[in-house]
A protein has these predicted regions:
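Phosphate/nucleotide-binding beta-alpha loop and adjacent structural elements of enzyme active sites
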Residues: 1-311
Length: 311
């Protein structure tokens, strides 16, 4: 051991360990993307990924001792990734600039934990891209339920020609506009501040207590705001889009309604779909049924009961 230590400096040893973690993390990610992993392998990959972030300097506020603790089995999985860091301040309603491994996002004080989770799900788990259902170069993408724009950022990195972001929350929409100001100016991103629904009109929209995510509220809710509702078929016509290649949809249980408002789009353009199916108990049945009613030629597969993919 003494001979080994004298030959390999501590810095080189750390580098070798880091390379081993990166290789192992890459192998885990490869298996995940090819549906060859169980939940345990997914968790192992996320642990290794955190050390990779530390080696790359992405989490400078976390010490090496703390980073090593977080990869241990005793550390709660959902609390392992404290990767969103507040690095700047700005005007309301988006007073915090967050730095994440996916880039910088304007948001509120509440958004740190949500950005942690979204980074974990999307940068490591690829929850919206599996097998043939992925964003391709020059795609036109609909990001339905855009939130602060994490998937919009991923789609742009994949080479999407245009991303249409649909987001009803006025605070999220304002933060999104600030984050993607340059991309909006050069025409690669367009924001539609509305809720996707089966028909145009207005809806009652209620925010969560701990974050800026929200959902369509029931008639009895007294704390909801009124937001504009759009049918995606109508929106496509209004924007004069000649194609849509990929739709990501995560809208807190309103997915079946939004898909019903996109029947013509699904029937004539057949975009690849990544749809959340865990918000309502019957989503795993109702969402695929809505897609098949619009276009019976879709092939589909699911992932752990959370996501459905159509192509």
């Amino acid at each position: 051991m003494y001979v080994l230590w004298s030959v390999i400096s501590p810095r080189r040893l750390i580098l070798l360990i880091g390379i081993a973690f990166v290789v192992a993390g890459g192998a885990g990610a490869f298996l995940i993307r090819h549906n060859a992993s169980l939940r345990t392998l997914y968790e192992l990959d996320t642990r290794l990924w955190f050390l990779q972030l530390k080696l790359q300097g992405e989490v400078p506020d976390v010490t090496w001792t703390e980073a090593l603790r977080r990869v241990g089995p005793e550390w709660p999985h959902r609390e392992r990734f404290d990767v969103a860091r507040a690095i700047g301040s700005g005007a309301a309603p988006c007073p915090v600039l967050w730095q994440t491994p996916l880039g910088k996002f304007w948001g509120t004080e509440k958004d740190g934990r949500e950005l942690d989770l979204l980074t974990l799900e999307q940068a490591v788990g690829d929850i919206y891209e599996q097998g043939p259902v992925a964003v391709r170069d020059s795609d036109v993408v609909l990001d339905v339920g855009a939130h602060l724009g994490t998937f919009t950022r991923i789609a742009l990195q994949r080479g999407a020609r245009l991303v249409i972001a649909v987001e009803p929350n006025p605070v999220n929409a304002a933060c999104f506009e600030r984050t993607f100001e340059e991309e909006i100016a050069n025409g690669r991103v367009r924001l539609v501040q509305a809720a996707a629904w089966h028909s145009p009109g207005s809806l009652q929209f209620e925010l969560g207590n701990a974050s800026q995510t929200g959902h369509v509220a029931g008639a009895q809710s007294g704390s909801a705001m009124t937001v504009r509702a759009v049918a995606l078929d109508d929106m496509i016509d209004e924007l004069k889009l000649d194609r849509v290649d990929f739709i990501k949809m995560d809208i807190e249980g309103a997915e079946r309604h939004a898909l019903a408002g996109a029947r013509r789009l699904l029937a004539t353009r057949k975009p690849r779909l990544a749809i959340c199916i865990y918000h309502a108990p019957d989503d795993p049945v109702a969402v695929p049924q809505t897609v098949r009613e619009a276009n019976g030629t879709y092939k589909t597969f699911t992932r752990e009961g959370f996501q459905a993919y159509f192509y």
